């Protein structure tokens, strides 16, 4: 799969050809995770509506939930104003975090909300 050239020209990638993907749950608005994408991962995501990412540690693409069953059906994808981050709005099945938690941001609060 090849990324649409009209989309590709708008992306700003790091030295490794990657850009950030922020993943938000459609039903709750919760931020679930942050991951990396390359052009092919984004192209596959746009084509299939299955969240595809790029693993820097394994140096390969992966489909969220392909082994765990904790899938992400992609409702929408938006590009930020700088072109270096995409926002995926998803319907999450199971936990989004590799630990099994609902969100990767469930455990370590550094500053609590003020009432």
UniProtKB/Swiss-Prot annotation:
Chief location: cytoplasm
InterPro entries the UniProt entry points to: PRA-CH, PRib_AMP_CycHydrolase_dom, PRib_AMP_CycHydrolase_sf
Cofactor note: Binds 1 Mg(2+) ion per subunit.
Top-level division of the source organism's lineage: Bacteria
Chain sites annotated for binding Zn(2+): 81, 97, 104
Entry's transmembrane regions: none
A Pfam family that the UniProt record links to this protein: PRA-CH
A GO cellular component annotation in the UniProt record: cytoplasm
One of the GO biological process terms: L-histidine biosynthetic process
GO molecular function terms noted in the UniProt entry: magnesium ion binding; phosphoribosyl-AMP cyclohydrolase activity; zinc ion binding
Cofactors required: Mg(2+); Zn(2+)
Catalysed reactions, as listed in the record: 1-(5-phospho-beta-D-ribosyl)-5'-AMP + H2O = 1-(5-phospho-beta-D-ribosyl)-5-[(5-phospho-beta-D-ribosylamino)methylideneamino]imidazole-4-carboxamide
Residue numbers binding Mg(2+): 80, 82, 84
EC number: 3.5.4.19
Biochemical pathway: Amino-acid biosynthesis; L-histidine biosynthesis; L-histidine from 5-phospho-alpha-D-ribose 1-diphosphate: step 3/9
Keywords: Amino-acid biosynthesis, Cytoplasm, Histidine biosynthesis, Hydrolase, Magnesium, Metal-binding, Zinc
UniProt KW Chloroplast keyword: no
Compartments in which it is found: Cytoplasm
Function in brief: Catalyzes the hydrolysis of the adenine ring of phosphoribosyl-AMP.
Family: Belongs to the PRA-CH family.
Subunit structure: Homodimer.
Name the record gives this protein: Phosphoribosyl-AMP cyclohydrolase
Source organism of this protein record: Mycobacterium leprae (strain TN)
């Amino acid at each position: 799969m090849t990324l649409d050239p009209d989309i590709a020209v708008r992306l700003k990638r790091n030295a490794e050809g990657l850009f950030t993907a922020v993943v938000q749950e459609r039903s709750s608005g919760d931020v679930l995770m942050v991951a990396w994408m390359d052009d092919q991962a984004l192209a596959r995501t746009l084509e299939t509506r299955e969240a595809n990412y790029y693993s820097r540690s394994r140096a390969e693409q992966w489909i969220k939930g392909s082994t765990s069953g904790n899938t992400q059906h992609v409702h929408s994808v938006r590009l930020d104003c700088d072109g270096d981050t995409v926002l995926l709005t998803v319907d999450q099945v199971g936990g989004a975090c590799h630990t099994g938690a609902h969100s990767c941001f469930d455990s370590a609060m550094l500053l609590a909300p003020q009432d």
